[in-house]
UniProtKB/Swiss-Prot annotation:
Enzyme category, top tier: oxidoreductase
Main location: cytoplasm
Protein name per UniProt: Soluble pyridine nucleotide transhydrogenase
Function per UniProt: Conversion of NADPH, generated by peripheral catabolic pathways, to NADH, which can enter the respiratory chain for energy generation.
Reactions catalysed, as given in the entry: NAD(+) + NADPH = NADH + NADP(+)
Lineage: Bacteria, Pseudomonadati, Pseudomonadota, Gammaproteobacteria, Pseudomonadales
Gene this chain is encoded by: sthA
Length: 464
């Protein structure tokens, strides 16, 4: 059995693992990474963020073509199968794997492909697909194994028409009707994707509002646009059982309703990938959702073992995971790169997309903060009119006395890009965080960024 010695070993090569490995090696540490796939990238690259966003982009292009009057001069609306649009995602995945493999090679980071489990707090065994076992010894470890869809025991995921958010990427046909159980971020994103392909979607939500962590106005806008695209949203519903048939699936709800569709997508919760790590050998225990508890330095209860990304829970975003991994390595190397990651913008890739940072109106009202609102509707923006993307708005929440920006919420074309301008100003200290920045700054024209100036004027006009 081969034995290798390192300063830092990172388990997982998703965003958190990559961030940790790169920061540790830049600090002069000898680093290795382990992944249970035969390629780097983690769930983010192979099953999550990258394929779903590539799918969304392809579907959005189809929708633009079908909805643009200019193209009606060429021919009738065109429809593509799910398998067709998935091909573009596969190409993006291959490019991402190639790029990330190069990152590890250029930085002289050793890569091991196999299942890692702890023998003790300084040793792991890596079991490769061919059965070969290697031992890695390290001073510190970073657990960045990510998460997977939660699967309740009473749902038969071996049935060929029942999927979760990982296996849906193996769907070989386009269903006429699809049931999505779970209206969180992933459920709403896939509802947008499939409805854009002409699929009738039933979106089952066990709450009374979609994505209730969002600003209420943004959540309402999402509900409207999903319904406008033939998504039937059913709130306050819970499943009783899922019945798989030869030609479809019947969802039995506790309310007594029955819904039949060609396929069923379970999208209700995720669990951390900790069950194969041998945590019991080092005195660690994951919670009921498979997540590992860490302190503000991303250190677990075992002093030389850290964790980052989805495996520690909130916020379960690729962007935050990378920074968490980088910060965990910063804690290990003490190279001043540590920070607790809590100022995280939300990006939701529905159609139209959503992004936000800071406080919502509900939160500010509950805290009795004297705020005001400035809005810019995209239908009045020249760039949105040119792009035929008139749905959406930018909303700025600011303190009515100091003009400090308290929250930015965006729904529509390029929302996930637009939000970062507001985030940058919000992160300025003291009087530099002010609504007046957008009044006193010249924006390119026509741009979507110009919405900040329009929203700022709108907000100032509400003051007296």
């Amino acid at each position: 059995m081969a034995v290798y010695n390192y300063d830092v070993v990172v388990i997982g090569t998703g965003p958190a693992g990559e961030g940790a490995a790169m920061n540790a090696v830049k600090a002069g540490r000898k680093v290795a990474v382990v992944d249970d796939r035969p390629q780097v990238g983690g769930n983010c690259t192979h099953l999550g963020t990258i394929p779903s966003k590539a799918l969304r982009h392809s579907v959005r292009q189809i929708m633009q073509y079908n909805n643009n009057p200019l193209f009606r001069q060429i021919g009738e609306p065109r429809w593509f199968s799910f398998a067709d649009v998935l091909k573009s995602a596969e190409q993006v995945i291959a490019k991402q794997v190639s790029s990330r493999t190069g990152y590890y090679a250029r930085n002289r980071i050793d890569t091991f492909f196999g299942t890692a489990s702890f023998c003790d707090e300084h040793t792991i065994e890596v079991v490769h697909l061919n059965g070969m076992v290697e031992t890695l010894v390290a001073k510190q470890f970073v657990i960045a194994t990510g998460s997977r869809p939660y699967r309740p025991a009473d749902v038969d995921f071996t049935h060929p028409r029942i999927y979760d958010s990982d296996t849906i990427l193996s769907l070989g046909h386009t269903p006429r009707r699809l049931i999505i159980y779970g209206a969180g971020v992933i459920g709403c994103e896939y509802a947008s994707i499939f409805s854009g392909l002409g699929v009738l979607v039933d979106l089952i939500d066990n709450r009374d509002q979609l994505l209730s962590f969002l600003d209420d106005e943004i959540s309402d806008s999402l509900s409207y646009h999903l319904r406008n695209n033939n998504v039937l949203i059913r709130h306050n519903e819970e499943y009783e059982r899922v019945e798989g048939l030869d030609n479809g699936v019947i969802l039995h709800l506790k309310s007594g309703k029955k819904i039949k569709a060609d396929a069923f997508l379970w999208s209700n919760g995720r669990t951390g990938n900790t069950d194969k790590l041998g945590l019991e050998n080092i005195g660690l225990k994951a919670n009921g959702r498979g997540q590992i508890q860490v302190d503000e330095h991303y250190r677990t209860e075992v002093s030389n073992i850290y964790a980052a990304g989805d495996v520690i829970g909130w916020p379960s975003l690729a962007s935050a995971a990378y920074d968490q991994g980088r910060s965990a390595a910063g804690s290990i190397t003490e190279n001043d790169s540590w920070r607790f990651v809590d100022d995280v913008p939300t990006g939701i890739y529905t159609i139209p997309e959503i992004s936000s940072v800071g406080k919502t109106e509900r939160e500010l009202t509950q805290a009795k903060v004297p705020y005001e609102v400035g809005k810019a509707f995209f239908k009045g923006m020249a760039r949105a009119q040119i792009a035929v993307e008139k749905a959406g708005m930018l909303k700025i929440l600011f303190h009515r006395e100091t003009l400090e920006i308290l929250g930015v919420h965006c729904f529509g074309y390029q929302a996930s890009e637009i939000v970062h301008i507001g985030q940058a100003i919000m992160n300025q200290k003291g009087e530099a965080n002010t609504l007046k920045y957008f009044i006193n700054t010249t924006f390119n024209y026509p741009t979507m960024a110009e919405a900040y100036r329009v929203a700022a004027y709108d907000g100032l006009n509400r003051l007296f």
